[in-house]
Amino acid sequence: KPYDTLEEVIGIRPSKGSLAEYGVTYRQVDLLPDGSFDYDKIRENINEKTHLVTIQRSKGYQTRPTLSVQRIGELMVDNCYGEFVETMEPSDVGADMIVGSLIKNPGGGLAPIGGYIAGKKECVENAAYRLTSPGLGKEVGASLGILKDFYQGFFLAPTVTAGALKGAIFAANVYEKLGFAVVPNGTESRHDIIQAITFGQPEGVIGFCQGIQAAAPVDSHVTPEPWDMPGYDAQVIMAAGAFVSGSSIELSADGPIKPPYAVYFQGGLTWQHAKFGILKSLQVLVQKGLVTEEQIRKAM
């Protein structure tokens, strides 16, 4: 299943200007109950009219495991949140094209905007022609005078991503010991920076996000609340007191207010800040009566 915000882009949920309006059809093959690929269904859904097979590496607003690089074959891969987490990238195992965001892992917290496309020449050129116009492709486009931030952020990205991973592992260990379901758990291998924590009630999701916001370097005085965000079929709450608007390699958390009431935590430009964010989230949950200080002492 794609990210919620892509459902209207594709046309799963009706929307003006969707791919469906332009006659582009879409088929979805879900993972099997054990998280493996349904190869029979995949074969059934590919025919001579198929132009693109794509896979989403990260979990989105689901609680399934993130897909490892080794499991991704010759596809177009949405690589968001997965860059620099493993020793290989999807292109190393045959992916035709990988795409992602520069305000996530590869921007290192410095890139203020942008995305990337990498892969086989034909695929990159096709994407470039669609982005601009036929005949121009990637030969034109605004650089906005910020290329230095791109390069410096890319240089720092592996270190920043490592700190975010450490923060996610810390969160998993603490919240699992408090009795909440976490994906992945504190000892499982990781393939992106996202930590899912299932609270089973909206108060937990809201309290967690309010704690993360309170730890932010920007707008820490703001109290996030769920709202009807465009592109989603349920209210969503987001905590992101970041230097770069929308940056989720910076300390952030979000989640839809619907069952199973899971929150998705990611980022932290340093491991110390990620740890501080988790401690603030615990403080808010204590204030809301969802956990006790004694439980936290035992979990730590």
In which residue ranges do the predicted regions lie?
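Conserved C-terminal alpha-helix-loop-beta "cap" of PLP-dependent enzymes
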Residues: 176-299
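Conserved PLP-enzyme active-site core in the AAT-like
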Residues: 1-166, 172-175, 179-183, 272-300
